[in-house]
Design a protein with these regions (language model features):
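Acidic, glycine-rich loop-and-beta core segments that form the ion-binding/anion-interacting portion
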Residues: 234-325
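Glycine-rich cofactor/substrate-binding loops
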Residues: 18-54, 115-116, 297-494
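A helix-coil-helix interface module used to build multimeric assemblies
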Residues: 15-219, 224-231, 292-293, 304, ...
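Short amphipathic alpha-helical segments with heptad-repeat character
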Residues: 135, 139-146, 150, 157, ...
Length: 494
């Protein structure tokens, strides 16, 4: 233990015998087991670029306000740049005894540039520092997810264009319901992911306010220019309440929620891929690049990656629930519990980036088996609703028409045939309103073509919908391109 008063106010012996940066009030070092238990460095080291950017902006503002000298600010900026370059290159060794990314960088900065490094933390607490790092990180993660979201939507729209004449059964309760265009089905997912993009943008916006200057919880007596720091870091504004600034994690929950809904959409699509690629359906054949085999059954071609995407949704949901439970009992302002806020967010973003990329690859390389889809359109009485509509359009109340066609379906099931297989005489016996043109109501392409309402599955309606989906992509790409300055995630922290 160093007893020099000039060091004691700033350092405290850590578990390894070196000094901590917060220890003036303590006489004993932390236990070795708590040193590792309390350290957040294994997680928050991935925010090193955000931490360095925040420190540069803070130092620049301190110099502009006359709180530190221009020479100190220049030394700090140069030192931080050198540290960032070393981390980027994989030439920086993180020490668990430094506790977190803030202490790791600050202690190394002080080692490199001396006294000026000790002035960096003037007017700042780790509470507002970590909140700033995390907000910058969420903006970067949301942006990455938005970009991957756009890429998947392009794949879906391209597939919808390619398969604009392919018809397959639509399902309710996993039972044959009505025929739809495959393009219509794929566009349904495109719209789901379009809503996800909007939620991701909302999470980005929720994080786009700067906590720096809130200090520990009550603000500071230094004449800080919070607006300058916020602008330097690309934030839209400052957070108006210092207590809220250091303790709010709603923006992280927004990212988790947006990610969870998107994971749910990915899981639903994955479930259909698993079903469609099965022998029972045979609607699609997955590329070998997106399938695996069995260690014992030579014939197997498994949709493992679709299943993994489906399974990983639970992991993403768990991260959302974890943070909700962590937050629900915290009084104002900062509590150490908040250290648990970052690992789940990083995991969710990494998981979803992989899922979005794999899904895009699966769809862009699959083979659609049009004959299998057409075959299934010939079973399950997909024309039943249109036969009922045929009678209703001729004056029979729809509920009575429904009963008539239900009786015909029952007759088909007893005979082991479909509605289109019934002789015309059987239709006339069921209702004198049936005429020879009933065959048009039984024709699958005609049924699809008749669904001309806005948002319907008729080719003409789907063509309009496709234009809207493409236009929405253009709008969202514009939104993506106009995002405020973002400190991108670094990949040098090993």
């Amino acid at each position: 233990m160093a007893h020099c008063f000039g060091r004691l106010f700033w350092y405290l012996e850590k578990g390894d015998g070196s000094m901590a940066l917060w220890g003036g009030r303590f006489e004993a070092g932390v236990a070795e087991v708590t040193q590792e238990f309390g350290a957040s460095l294994p997680v928050d080291k991935h925010l090193y670029k955000q931490d360095i950017a925040g420190s540069k902006a803070h130092a620049k503002m301190l110099a502009a306000q006359g709180i530190i000298s221009a020479e100190d600010e220049q030394a700090i900026a140069k030192g931080l740049t050198g540290i960032e370059q070393d981390i980027d290159a994989g030439n920086f060794t993180f020490d668990i005894n430094d506790e977190d990314i803030h202490m790791s960088i600050e202690s190394e900065l002080t080692r490199r540039i001396g006294e000026a490094g000790k002035r960096l933390h003037t007017g700042r607490s780790r509470n507002d520092q970590v909140a700033t790092d995390t907000r910058l990180g969420v903006k970067a993660l949301a942006k990455e997810l938005m970009e991957a979201n756009l890429e998947l939507r392009h794949v879906l729209v391209d597939a919808a264009k390619k398969y604009d004449k392919v018809i397959l059964p639509g399902y309710t309760h996993m039972q044959h319901a009505q025929p739809v265009l495959l393009s219509h089905h794929l566009l349904a997912y495109s719209w789901m992911f379009a809503r996800d993009f909007t939620r991701l943008k909302a999470a980005f916006d929720a994080a786009d306010n700067c906590p720096l200057g809130a200090a520990a919880l009550a603000g500071t007596s230094y004449p800080l220019n919070r607006q300058m720091t916020a602008a330097e870091l690309g934030f839209a504004d400052v957070i108006p309440n210092s207590l809220d600034a250091v303790s709010d994690r709603d923006f992280l929950l927004d990212l988790h929620y947006a990610g969870s809904v998107m994971a749910m959409h990915l899981s639903r699509l994955s479930e259909e891929i698993v079903l469609w690629s099965s022998s029972e359906f045979g609607f699609i054949t997955l590329s070998d690049s997106y399938s695996t085999g069995s260690s014992i059954m030579p014939q197997k071609k498994n949709p493992d990656f679709a299943e993994l995407i489906r399974g990983k949704s639970g992991r993403v949901y768990g991260n959302l629930v974890q943070l909700l439970v962590t937050m629900k009992g915290l009084p104002l302002a900062y509590n150490k519990d908040l250290q648990e806020d970052k690992e789940g967010a990083l995991d969710t973003a990494r998981t979803l980036m992989q899922c979005l990329s794999v899904m895009a690859g699966m769809i862009s390389t699959w083979t659609v088996n049009e004959d299998a889809m057409a075959r299934e359109c010939g079973v399950g009485h997909l024309a039943a609703t249109d036969v009922a509509d045929y009678l209703a359009k001729r004056g029979l109340p729809f509920r009575e028409a429904h009963a008539v066609v239900g009786h015909l379906v029952l007759m088909c099931e007893k005979r082991g045939c479909n509605l289109e297989d019934l002789p015309f005489e059987v239709f006339q016996e069921a209702s004198p309103l049936f005429e020879r043109d009933i065959t048009e109501a039984l024709d699958i392409p005609s049924i699809v073509a008749a669904r001309t309402t806005e948002g319907g599955t008729a080719p003409a309606a789907v063509a309009v919908q496709l234009q809207r989906a493409e236009a929405q992509l253009v709008v969202d790409e514009g939104v993506f391109g106009s995002l405020t300055k973002v400190v991108e995630m670094g990949h040098g922290a090993k």
